[in-house]
Amino acid sequence: MGKRWSFVAVLLLTVSFFSWLMSGTGEARGGKEVQPVEQQTKTILFVPHDNRPTSCEQSAEAAEKLGYRVLMPPKEMLGGLTEGQPDALWYWAEAQAAQADAAVISTDSLIYGGLVASRKHELSEQELEERVGRIASLKKLNRRLKVYAFGSLMRTPVSGLASGGEEPDYYLTYGAQIFRRSGLLDKQEHGGLTDGETQELQDLAATIPSEVWQDWTQRRAKNFTVDERLIDLSRTGALDLFILGKDDNAPLSATHAESLWLARYATAVPCTRFQMLAGIDEFAALLLARAVNDEEHVVPFVNVQYNWGVGGAMVPDYSDEPLVDSIQSDLLIAGAVAVPDPAHADLVLLVNTPPDGKMGYGNAPDNDGTDLYDAQSLARYAGSLIAQGYRVVIADITRTNGADNALMNALRDEGLLFKLYGYAGWNTATNSVGFALGQGVLSVRLPEDDVDCLLLARYLDDWGYQSNVRTAVTNQLAMLLDGGAYLNLGRYEPAVRLRVTRLLRDFAARNLPPYPGVDHLNFYFPWHRMFIGGIVLPDR
């Protein structure tokens, strides 16, 4: 792998070096001004992997603000907690492809009907093969179209609770046992088991009903074959780039085992055509950035820095690889390259990692503003970089599913919130890093007002909702109504939506500078559950 990375890095550095020599510099927002490339309006066909705001409009927003026309299917075609309309999505994509310069497509949507549907489907092998064939035909029918595709390896949640009801129903009962059994099988193949583990594996086989295990493993086998066929498409050039995500992964699991098998299968495919890494929800933002960078023949320089401590060596929750490896993959996906000196960078990606490498949770009681991860130092360092003229993007990953309140309070108090060029602190660490990078490499070319608009969405969601309002309202639901309402709001949804809207407006008034429309923002639940929210401003 080292030689493959070295070759690509040298190639990208060469292209970028000449671009840098030819570029002029000025001052804007505390950083060097990057002028957008003059161009005619370009069109990107975009099929998201589900209907969440982060998957759809938020992933596309930076490209749209740069002047690109991003064609997205009607949301009713996309999957959510239930299957979308893969046939309708295909006919829509086929009809729109002729007017597009590039396509960023979710193979999960076009084959299974969405990300969640990929874990629950009852499709036959023949149906799956036919749908893979459709994707292959997209390039044949539109020779000039660049096709960037992304899909997921079927995940292996650690328990029924962790699955969030997004697996087959039996996972709520047997999820922990399925996860453990798959992990022991992974270890058995790649390292061997102790006598105690061998006995535990036998006990688990007796505990999990055979029909449950058969259903789960047979679906995985079908999806695995689909992934092999998609890798073949990247091998032959039917896909210009295919990214396969190890969704909600762990070092010992079925997902990890399958990734090793697929890595061997793809040995001869260059990393410029196929990559496999932890994550999934961030891939649309990264590939849309890649499509823009390819169209404009731009290779952004990115300087990556971490909080003190283990930094890039940490293996984040829901991942099976060191963070530094995931970030290197993200850079290549976005068409960017890492540089050691921030003076030569288009942006500095500052990663807020926990010093000991152990992540917390956005909804944990200790996320009360107490500085557990030396956030004050990170905020001051970000301020010093900005004062020196560097464009800074922050990936906030000390916690899963929400921002670090201590960091955000420090950025607020130092007046830095709207001096950044990007921020993300939502869901998993790899989601946040990839999304921050995908938006960041484009936002450095945007006017300040547009950058502020992108930042506002993240602050309201990642900081306001996920780390504060959601936690408060969830606790109230548990005490006053029904703890089960978290996963299915049911009849409580209208009242909860009003409560969240009011609290989020109050949060913005206390923590953010005045911004048009924030005092009239509205909130909704795309999947009718507390975990995922959507924020709408009157003028957006």
Spans of model-derived segments:
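Bacterial N-terminal signal peptides
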Residues: 9-20
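Generic low-complexity, intrinsically disordered sequence content enriched
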Residues: 15-17, 25-26, 142
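Signal peptide processing junction and immediate N-terminal pro/mature segment
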Residues: 21-33
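An N-terminal assembly and electron-transfer interface module characteristic of large anaerobic redox
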Residues: 31-540
